[in-house]
Amino acid sequence: MNYKDTLLMPKTDFPMRGGLPNKEPQIQEMWDNDDQYRKALEKNKNNPSFILHDGPPYANGNLHMGHALNKIIKDFIVRYKTMQGFYAPYVPGWDTHGLPIEQALTKKGVDRKKMSVAEFREKCKEFALKQIDIQKKDFKRLGVRGDFNNPYITLTPEYEAAQIRLFGEMADKGLIYKGKKPVYWSPSSESSLAEAEIEYHDKRSASIYVAFDVKDSKGKVDSDAQFIIWTTTPWTIPSNVAITVHPELKYGQYNVDGHKYIVAQALSEEVAEALGWDKDSIQLEKEFTGKELEFVEAQHPFLDRVSLVINGEHVTTDAGTGCVHTAPGHGEDDYIVGQKYDLPVISPLNDKGVFTEEGGPFEGMFYDKANKAVTDLLKEKDALLKLDFITHSYPHDWRTKKPVIFRATPQWFASINKVKQDILDAIEDTNFKVDWGKTRIYNMIRDRGEWVISRQRVWGVPLPVFYAENGDIIMTKETVNHVADLFEKYGSNIWFEKEAKELLPEGFSHPGSPNGEFTKETDIMDVWFDSGSSHRGVLETRPELSFPADLYFEGSDQYRGWFNSSITTAVATRGQAPYKFLLSHGFVMDGEGKKMSKSLGNVIVPDQVVKQKGADIARLWVSSTDYLSDVRISDEILKKTSDVYRKIRNTLRFMLGNINDFNPETDSIAETNLLEVDRYLLNRLREFTASTINNYENFDYLNIYQEVQNFINVELSNFYLDYGKDILYIEKKDSHKRRSMQTVLYQILIDMTKLLAPILVHTAEEVWSHTPHVKEESVHLSDMPKVVDVDEELLEKWNTFMNLRDDVNRALEQARNEKVIGKSLEAKVVIGNNETFNTAEFLQQFNDLQQLFIVSQVEVKDKVKLKILIR
C-alpha cells in the first residue's frame, strides 16, 4: 500500500484560483434569480431598522474610483447591519437635472433651437435614463446589493412633486423670496451658481490702484485730496457708487510730493511701497477715523457720478488701502452695505458677461476684455496710480472650469439667515465619526449667505411661481400644491407644455389680473435643491424607509453640497437634521498621491479593475484604505491587494479541505473536552470576532483588513494550521485529537466567512457554497457571529507560550540561514530558564511540545538560563 493512501489528505472542490472576473457574474446572477435583496429584508422585517440614505450620483459619465469607493463602503455598512439582524433597506438614487446633461446633448449634435423646450427636456430625460442604466449595471458588478429595480430618480413625477411640496412649505414660512442681489454668475454656463457649485483655482488678474478726487469734503478733508482704492477687477469700476471705510480705523491724509492721498494709517507703508513713494517725501497732514469720513463725497474717475464715502464693518487691513471700492451690483459685502445707504445697484452685464448699453463706452465688451479698456481710460484721466498683475485664488464654475463673477440679477432665494441658528443647533445634535467633520459643516453653515435657488436653464424642476398682470408674485399654498399635484400626475414637463392659466387651479383669480391673464416663472431650481429634497422625496415617501436616516455617507466635498442642502431644507420644514450620523470619505488619488488625469496616464477605473482582477479585489482594496482622508490606488497597490486576497483564499481553502469529513452535528467535541491548544484558538477566534464586530460598528475597515491578515498569518498559517497538519493527515479519522481540531477549524471557517462576507461578498458566498452542513442558503442570509466572553486566564497562558515560540522560531530561522538545518523538523531545541521567568516550570503545563514548536525534539532544562540550541 502506498503510504500516501493512508493519509487523510484535504479534499475540496473549492478552487485554488479565484477566477473572479468570470465567476463573480455567475454568483450575481444567482443572487438576482433568488431575489436575495428581498429575502434579506424579509428575514429581518420585524426587527429594528437601519437606514443608510444614498446620496445620488450624477447621471452622466462612466464610474470612476471615487464612485466605487463610495458605493462599496455603503455596501459594507448595509450588509453588515443586515447580518446583525437589522432591517436595512438600501435604495440607490440618481441626480438627473442640470447643465452637464444639456451640454452632453449639445456635444451629441442636438440643436435645441430646432425644438421646443418640452421636446429638448424629453431628450434630456432619455439621456439621463440611459446613463442610469449604464451606471446601475456597473454598481451591481461591484457586488453592491440594493433595490436597483426600484431606485429613486430626481426626474420622476413623484419625486418632483415631493420637491415642490417641500418648496411650498418653505414658502409658507416666509423662507422663499425674490430679490435682486449679486450672486455667483457663470458667463460660461449663463446661469447663477450656488456656493456649492464654486471651486477655486489660480487666476492671473490685473491689480490696480485708483485715485478718486474729493468732490465735497464736508469740511473734513482737504478739497484737493484723493482717496486711493485697490482692486483686482477693473471691469467693476464703471459700477462703482461708493468708497467704504471702517468706522473705527484710523485714516491719514498724506502729502506725497504735493499730492494729497487718503489711506488707512495701518496700510500706509504697504501703499507707499506698492506705489514707489519716497519715504522721505511722505508727510502725514491730517488724521481721522473712518466714522469722521462718512458722507464725504468723491468723484467717479470717468463718470459723472458721486462716489459716496460710507462705513462698513467688512473693511480690513489685510490688503489694499483701507478704502474699499464699492459696487453693490458686483459684490455681496458691497450690496449689504449699499442697502444701508440706499445706494443704486448697477450691473451693466448681460447673461454672457458682456457689457450692455448701460456700460457706456464698454458696451459689447466681454467683462474680462474690458479690464484693459477700463485701465486705459483711468490712465487717460490721470486716475491710475499703478497697474500690476497678480496670481490669486479665484472662484470658478465647477462644471465649465471657467471664472465666475458676482452679478446682481433678479433671483429666487431660500433664506438661510432665518433658520441658520436652528441648522447649527441641529448639527450639534448630529453624531460624527471625526470632530473635523462637524467643524467643517458647522463653519460652512455659520458663514453661509442666502441660498440662490434659481437657475436660468431649462433642464430642471420649474419654480412653481406665477405673475399677475401687474407683476405681483403668486406663490400661495393653493397654487403650489396644485402644481405639485399636476407634476405628480403628468411630470414637470407639463409646465413647459401648458399656459400659465392651465397650470393654475380651476377658476383661480387674482386682483392683480383683472383680465384673468397670468405668466409663469421661467427659471428652474438649483440641482442642490433637487437632491437636498431627497429626505422628503425618498425617506418620507418610501414605505420601507423612514425620516431621519441613520446615516448619510458621501465624499468630503458634500459638506458644502448634499449634506448642506439636505440639512437646510430638513430643518426649514421638519425642524431637525435628516441624518443622525454623518460620515465622509476622501478622494481617490494615484499611487503617488496625485490627482488622476488622462494626460498623466495614471487613471484607473472600476471597470478595468473588475475585468482584470475582479470586484472582490476592488472591495478588498477599499477595506485597506484610510478612507477618511484621500486614498491611493495604482497597479502596484492592486497587485499587493491581490497577494493578500490569495493568502486569504488559500487559508479558507485549506480549512475547507480539512473539514470535508466533519459533520458538526455528530462529530463536534464539547468545548470543555477540547484539547487546550484548540480551546486557545477558539478563544483567539472570539477575540478576533469581537474586535472585527467593533470595527464594523465604528466603520473602521482598515483595522479589519489588518487584523484579518494578522489572524490568518500569525495565528493560523504560522501556527495552528502548520501545527495541525500531522493531526489532520495522520491521526485516525475519528480520533479525539483530530475531531477536537476539526471542531475549532469548522468554527473558524464559519465565523471568518461571515466576518469577511460584507467585504469579500463573492468569495464568501463561494466558500459558503463549499462548506458542508451549513443551514442558510447564502452566507449573506446568515447572522454575524455573536460576541462572547473569552477565557482570559487561558489566553494569558498561551500568549506567554506564543512569545516563547517566537523566540524559538527566530533561533530556527538563524540556524537555517547558517545552514545548520534545512527544515525545522531536523532540529532539537533546548530551552532553559531566564533570570525572571521559570521557563521549564511553565512548559511543564504543555503536551506535545515538539509538535507545537514543529521540531523533532524539545528538551527543557531546569536551573539554567534561557537558551535555545539547535542540535
From Swiss-Prot:
ATP binds at residue 598. One of its GO terms (biological process) is isoleucyl-tRNA aminoacylation. It is found in: Cytoplasm. GO terms for molecular function: aminoacyl-tRNA deacylase activity; ATP binding; isoleucine-tRNA ligase activity; tRNA binding. Its EC number is 6.1.1.5. L-isoleucyl-5'-AMP binds at residue 554. Gene3D superfamilies: 1.10.730.20, HUPs, Ile-tRNA synthetase CP2 domain-like. IleRS has two distinct active sites: one for aminoacylation and one for editing. The misactivated valine is translocated from the active site to the editing site, which sterically excludes the correctly activated isoleucine. The single editing site contains two valyl binding pockets, one specific for each substrate (Val-AMP or Val-tRNA(Ile)). Catalyzes the attachment of isoleucine to tRNA(Ile). As IleRS can inadvertently accommodate and process structurally similar amino acids such as valine, to avoid such errors it has two additional distinct tRNA(Ile)-dependent editing activities. One activity is designated as 'pretransfer' editing and involves the hydrolysis of activated Val-AMP. The other activity is designated 'posttransfer' editing and involves deacylation of mischarged Val-tRNA(Ile). This is Isoleucine--tRNA ligase. It comes from Staphylococcus epidermidis. The gene is ileS.
